[in-house]
UniProtKB/Swiss-Prot annotation:
The protein, known as: Exodeoxyribonuclease 7 large subunit
Self-association and partners: Heterooligomer composed of large and small subunits.
GO biological process: DNA catabolic process
Primary localization class, coarse: cytoplasm
Disruption phenotype: Essential, neither gene for this protein can be deleted.
Gene field: xseA
Amino acid sequence: MSDNIYSVSQLNSAARQMLEGNFCQIWLTGEISNFTQPVSGHWYLTLKDENAQVRCAMFRMKNLRVAFRPQNGMQVLVRANVSLYEPRGDYQLIIDSMHPAGEGLLQQQFEALKMKLAAEGLFAQNLKKTLPHFSKAVGIITSSTGAALQDILHILARRDPSLKVVIYPTAVQGKEATAEIVQMIELANARQEVDVLIVGRGGGSLEDLWCFNEEEVARAIFRSTLPIISAVGHETDVTIADFVADLRAPTPSAAAELVSRNQDELLQQLRHQQQRLDMAFDRLFTRKSQRLKQLALRLQNQHPQNQLRAQQAKNEQLTHRLQLAILRQFENTQQKFTALSVRLKQNPLPYRIQRYQQGLEQLKVRLNFCVNRQVTERQNKLATLCGKLDGLSPLKVLARGYSIAENPQGKAIVSVKDVNQGDFITTQVADGKIVSKVL
């Protein structure tokens, strides 16, 4: 008996994980039966063939994109994920997209070619050519008898009657359409008589529009040196040509509006630009006029006569200031003289002389006293120093019986090593010198 014992829930969960993990999204064709749509909006159905059947579910957010109403007995192509409904243990498919069997095969081819061309870089945004801002000539590659051409011509005539139009007629449906569309694209590029190309047609089924999903058409659009606008079918129709073209228009009429200039809009733009130009000119004129007035005023201020007047006024001002300064100086001097006169009157000169003489006598007495005191102090200090110096004199030492011996060079002899045999030495005593010879 196995050690792993599953519950029913565990088994169903493991089976669901195994199914979902081992099956990527798959394409499946079969006949619809048991189709139901409850109030939730989800679709529940069975897909079957002669030998087997499988339960399927398509949730509401997915089935809203389906362009038809499924019916029992209808053959369809679905893209789905394999799963398992755990509460009942039912193996089922969760449908992502659904197409009638014929269109479904075309849709599968569409997706495969789209992935291939995208991988090669044919859809790269950096390779898209820019449409001219103002086209002088536009080329139209479409059926010469289709309603799309008439819609384009009508809009171009209404919006931009002066725009040159070149029609490159081609089939846009059937076996010959692909080759003719490629041929017209190459012809337009060879002639170089237009600025931009519109490639498109009116609405139709997927089979009707299929020539615009052909690889040859996609590569011709990619090789074109002229900018190309794809305008195939209605807004909901998407083709390979839309991805490769430099710009996609939702309809042929919209493409005509993209390449044409609306005359009324152009006139309005011209009026607006004229207004802006007038306003700019007025601002420039006003600014230049103000500048001219400023320069004229500066020129007037810098005129020699004006400068001379200004200098004269400055000289007069300086002269006036100098006169005021002299007058103030004279008044100050006069005030000082008056003050001195008053002081002289208050203190007569003889009295002041007598007072100064008395002060001078006092200073003389004080000076004599200070000088005598300084001389006495210096004499006493000198006598003290002389006594000390006399005590240190070599003569005093000699007087006490000592003597000083000197070699012939006059240096004092302090050791027997300082003399040699035969040298004459001099001996200094208190009252004279004695010359001796060393034996």
